[in-house]
Structures are given as structure tokens and as C-alpha cells.
């Protein structure tokens, strides 16, 4: 499949990928946990959350009059040396009349409860949405169309197309976010460091580990099927599958680092979310057929628009600057660094430091067995922690409502 920028102006509207994801089911459930993922305090003893908007997670299945409920504090603990240790609280959303505080009316005062309601909500209505059965349904990603919680809270990135086997995927993608501003109320801005972008590759890698194994025969088939249907298997270089990288013509995407690492390079994972699907490419492109001596050549010209107010706009621009016509180059921070020396003079017998005296080794105390540590948690705490599916500290980008966060891989 050929691709490229439009050669000239056209009256046809520019094709744009419509981003979307799964939503909570319309019918209630007999479970006992929240439909949505938690928001988590960044520090211990943080005050209750305040929301820039209504505080009600987006759910198009409910009428505006039904968009109200409460956020409930969930104390969290983790096992450690000497017993359990508290970690920052998590807050879960439940619709009015459901969940642990189902007996409360909207607005009733209770410690650890924050009531929220959307515009036009009828707070006298008690929801029949029910709660989630964790054996049948995964947590649903949080989206706040009118603004999320204040900067004291974060939530983890959940791939919108993950299955039951993908729970640990989101754990590796937990991310901190800055306090939201008016310009970015629909998303969460974060730094653009390359090491954060690189970790995005774990999304695909974890899914591969949890899913079916790719045999050598399968990998070879993936790399050598019809050119327009090829995908890069793990441990393959880009040029092994799609040929050498070039400049100014087809095959011009990817620098030397991306070529060597293949799908392990997190920039691949990010940019795949801007690539059109097969249907979008066929029906949203300008298609140009040409008969050539060797056969029929089809050229697909498609434009994906990343808005300037997208939380990851700067990251995408940076990746394009690095990788378009990037053959023969590497990211600046990927260049090998010279080894530093404490002195410019070569070491001689006269100025060499005296050998250090070896200290006697201390006997290591035997570590507690895992089963002994786990006993530090009560059964109630273990059950509560079972709901906390994504607990890693924020180490990577929270893509939020950005092009990456909304498009299926």
C-alpha cells in the first residue's frame, strides 16, 4: 500500500479519524464494584477530590437526568516489611442508589463520600445501572468531557481495546498528570521526555506476553505475507519487513533507533494510533489507481489531523521531526556518551589511589516469605485491594483524551 501527502488541493473534505472507545453496558449488573476505574490521590491524607466539571464520568448510555452519583473513598494498603503500609487513597464512582452507599439519598452527608451531578440531572432518581461483576466485566476508562479532578489526583491509562487478559497492561501505563487548565480540560498534559514515550511500547509487549505466543513460523509469516498486510513481529528490525529506510519517497519513516528496535520503540506504538484502519484508508482516502507493466498500482492518500490542543500534540510533532526522513540519524539523547574520568592525567603509580580496604561482609537477614507478608492483610483488605487493578506508581505518560488515548491499536 502506497501512502503519501496529497499532491494538490482538492474540494473533498480532509478525512479525519473519529476516535472512540467502549462504554458501560446499558443493562445493570449484579456485581458489587464500580463500573469505572479509580482516581488515585498522589499523596497520603489528600483532601477529597474537587472537579473542574460536573465530576460525573462520561456515559452516553444514560440520559442527562440520570447523570449523578457519588465518589467513595477506598483506603488502600500494601504488604511490606513489618506489616502492611498505607498508600494514597483511591476514589470510586457509583451511581446514586448503587454501590456501598446505595441506601443514601443524593446529597446525604457521610464521611468519605463526594456527591456529583451533571447538568440537568434529576438527583431524586435512583439508578438501575447497578454495579460491576468483576468476573464478567473489566473496569471502564474514565473520560470527563467537562473537566476531571484537581491536580491532587491521577488515573491510569487503560487501552480501550484491552480484553480480560490485559489487566497488567494498564498497570505498566500508570501516569501522573499536571493540574488541569482551561485549555486542556479534556485531557491531561505531561512531560515529553523520550524515556516516557519509550515506555508506551510496553502496552503492545505486555499484550503479546499475556496473549498467545508468536512462534518462529508465525513471525516469519507475519514478515513475509503480502507487502500491504505485513506487520513487524517481535525482535524484527523494520528493514527486515519493509525494506531499507529512505528519504523523500516511500519508506521514509523511521530513524536508525526505530529501525533497530522495531516495535520495542515506543514511538512506533504512539504513531500507530494515528495510522488509519483498513476501512478508513479505503473509504476516507483519495484513491488513485494506475496500470503499470508489473500490475495495478493503488495509491492511498489519507490525512490524520492531530489538533493543536491535543495533550500529546508536542510529542507527535517531536516524533515526526525525528522519524520522517530519519534514516542515518538517532534521537539526541540516544547518542553514546563518552566515559568520564575523574582526572585528565593518565593514572600512574605515583598518583594512583591506594587500594580500598575491604569491609567485612554483614550477614544478611533471611527475608520473610511471601505468604508470611500476605498474612499482614486482613480478608477485607485483600478483597478491597482486589478491586485496585492498577496500582503502579506513575512512571509514564497519561495519554488521557488524546489521539493515542482514544484510538484502538
Swiss-Prot record:
Domain CoV N CTD, residue spans: 215-331
Record-linked InterPro entries: N_prot_C_CoV, N_prot_N_CoV, NCAP_gCoV, Nucleocap_CoV, Nucleocapsid_C, Nucleocapsid_N
Superkingdom, natural source: Viruses
Database matches in PROSITE patterns: COV_N_CTD, COV_N_NTD
Disulfide bonds, paired cysteine numbers: 320-323
This protein's UniProt keywords: ADP-ribosylation, Disulfide bond, Host Golgi apparatus, Phosphoprotein, Ribonucleoprotein, RNA-binding, Transcription, Transcription regulation, Viral nucleoprotein, Virion
Modified residues (Phosphothreonine): 378
Domain CoV N NTD: 31-156
Family: Belongs to the gammacoronavirus nucleocapsid protein family.
Binding partners and assembly: Homooligomer. Both monomeric and oligomeric forms interact with RNA. Interacts with protein M. Interacts with NSP3; this interaction serves to tether the genome to the newly translated replicase-transcriptase complex at a very early stage of infection.
Protein name: Nucleoprotein
Annotated gene: N
Amino acid at each position: 500500500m502506497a501512502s503519501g501527502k496529497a499532491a494538490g488541493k482538492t474540494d473533498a473534505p480532509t478525512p479525519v479519524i473519529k476516535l472512540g472507545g467502549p462504554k458501560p453496558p446499558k443493562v445493570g449488573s449484579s456485581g458489587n464494584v464500580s463500573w469505572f476505574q479509580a482516581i488515585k490521590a498522589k499523596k497520603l491524607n489528600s483532601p477529597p477530590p474537587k472537579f473542574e466539571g460536573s465530576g460525573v464520568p462520561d456515559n452516553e448510555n444514560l440520559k442527562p437526568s440520570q447523570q449523578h452519583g457519588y465518589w467513595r473513598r477506598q483506603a488502600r494498603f500494601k504488604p511490606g516489611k513489618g506489616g502492611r503500609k498505607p498508600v494514597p487513597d483511591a476514589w470510586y464512582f457509583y451511581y446514586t442508589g448503587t454501590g456501598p452507599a446505595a441506601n443514601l439519598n443524593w446529597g446525604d452527608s457521610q464521611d468519605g463520600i463526594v456527591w456529583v451531578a451533571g447538568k440537568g440531572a434529576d438527583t431524586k432518581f435512583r439508578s438501575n445501572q447497578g454495579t460491576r461483576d468483576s468476573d464478567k466485566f473489566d473496569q471502564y476508562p474514565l473520560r470527563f468531557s467537562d473537566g476531571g479532578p484537581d491536580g491532587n489526583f491521577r488515573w491510569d491509562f487503560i487501552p480501550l481495546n484491552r480484553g480480560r487478559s490485559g489487566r497488567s497492561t494498564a498497570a505498566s501505563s500508570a501516569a501522573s498528570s499536571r493540574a488541569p487548565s482551561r485549555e486542556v480540560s479534556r485531557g491531561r498534559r505531561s512531560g515529553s521526555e523520550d524515556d516516557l514515550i519509550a515506555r508506551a511500547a510496553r502496552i503492545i509487549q505486555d499484550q503479546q506476553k499475556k496473549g498467545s505466543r508468536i512462534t518462529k513460523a508465525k513471525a516469519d509469516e507475519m514478515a513475509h505475507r503480502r507487502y500491504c498486510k505485513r506487520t513487524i513481529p517481535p525482535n524484527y528490525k523494520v528493514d527486515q519487513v519493509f525494506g531499507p529506510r529512505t528519504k523523500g519517497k516511500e519508506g521514509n519513516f523511521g530513524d536508525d533507533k526505530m529501525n533497530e528496535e522495531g516495535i520495542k520503540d515506543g514511538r512506533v506504538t504512539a504513531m500507530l494510533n494515528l495510522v488509519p484502519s483498513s476501512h478508513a484508508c479505503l473509504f476516507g482516502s483519495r484513491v488513485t489507481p494506475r496500470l503499470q507493466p508489473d500490475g495495478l498500482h493503488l495509491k492511498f492518500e489519507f490525512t490524520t489531523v492531530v489538533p493543536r490542543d491535543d495533550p500529546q500534540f508536542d510529542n507527535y510533532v517531536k516524533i515526526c521531526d525525528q522519524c520522517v526522513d530519519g534514516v542515518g540519524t538517532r534521537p539526541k539523547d540516544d547518542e553514546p556518551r563518552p566515559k568520564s574520568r575523574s582526572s585528565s592525567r593518565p593514572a600512574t603509580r605515583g598518583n594512583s589511589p591506594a587500594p580500598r580496604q575491604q569491609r567485612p561482609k554483614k550477614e544478611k537477614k533471611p527475608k520473610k516469605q511471601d505468604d508470611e507478608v500476605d498474612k499482614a492483610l486482613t480478608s477485607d483488605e485483600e478483597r478491597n485491594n482486589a478491586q485496585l487493578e492498577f496500582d503502579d506508581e506513575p512512571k509514564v505518560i497519561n495519554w488521557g483524551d488524546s489521539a493515542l488515548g482514544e484510538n484502538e491499536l
